[in-house]
Amino acid sequence: MSQNSLRLVEDKSVDKSKALEAALSQIERSFGKGSIMKLGSNENVVEIETISTGSLGLDIALGVGGLPRGRIIEIYGPESSGKTTLALQTIAEAQKKGGICAFVDAEHALDPVYARKLGVDLQNLLISQPDTGEQALEITDTLVRSGAVDVLVVDSVAALTPRAEIEGEMGDSLPGLQARLMSQALRKLTASISKSNTMVIFINQIRMKIGVMFGSPETTTGGNALKFYASVRLDIRRIGAVKEREEVIGNQTRVKVVKNKMAPPFKQVEFDIMYGEGVSKTGELVDLGVKAGIVEKSGAWFSYNSQRLGQGRENAKTFLRDNPDLAREIELSLRQNAGLIADRFLQNGGPDPDDGDAAAEM
């Protein structure tokens, strides 16, 4: 820029609209067309594109109908809580719409048989099993910059081991190395993710902070950078078992939206994750239907429009599984009442005392 363009205008009588136009044209000449614009001038900027999580209840709790594209998502929780299952179901939903998906398997633990059962098209899933954290994040950066990938999952942040740690000896102390790696990578990635409209899901693990007297001792790995860059953070927990007589056939799962830049946060939803099947859609229809008043519950009996679905929740689920048209009708009614259901999620899942950090990040 020339010195004249940097001159500060001090005259109070100057026409502000003309001064603004001159400034905008100067910025566009220097940095290219589209480097600055009025937000409402481009309708595509305002609209939020989403991809379903595979859980109707979670889609409603997120407030925008699913996970937003062009954003960073973090899914964290204890071991065997359903983190990878939720990510794989999001991939399956994206593939149903013709999207291209990639899975960076830093843990080297992806089970292709289980992924296929969840509906993932393995023939069209890109997979990488990198040796180091730097390699994993370089691959992620290259795929995002290509603009051809719709959903990219990194499993997990805890397994992104810096090269210096791998080449060093056991017992070497390298404090903050992984946190610095994540901080640098996210600084590079965030603009590319927004421009390419790629959804990047980071799966994360939980660690315990030593010496915490008050509040939750839990924290996620990889430093604080991901907490700030993530538009949505999901805390997923196993809260019980789903049994058929004495046999355990699934997990009762609770997901809490601890951070959400797209809609009000702190909503929580509960659903069943069945072994070899994923999220139980029929179970969600029964539970959400009762919550919204669409499905009537009288004693142990469930009914819809005076038609009995079954005695007991499992029988009602079986009936809906055998009658997909009726299940689709209930789902349509639930989506039309999504606002009402979301308000009830907020009432049930207000912020816990431990969520102060998450609230402060917003």
Curated annotation (Swiss-Prot):
SUPFAM superfamilies: P-loop containing nucleoside triphosphate hydrolases (SSF52540), RecA protein, C-terminal domain (SSF54752). ATP binds at residues 77-84. PROSITE patterns: RECA_1, RECA_2, RECA_3. Gene3D superfamilies: P-loop containing nucleotide triphosphate hydrolases (3.40.50.300). CDD domains: RecA (cd00983). The keyword Magnesium does not apply. Keywords: ATP-binding, Cytoplasm, DNA damage, DNA recombination, DNA repair, DNA-binding, Nucleotide-binding, SOS response. Belongs to the RecA family. This is Protein RecA. It comes from Rhizobium leguminosarum bv. trifolii (strain WSM2304).
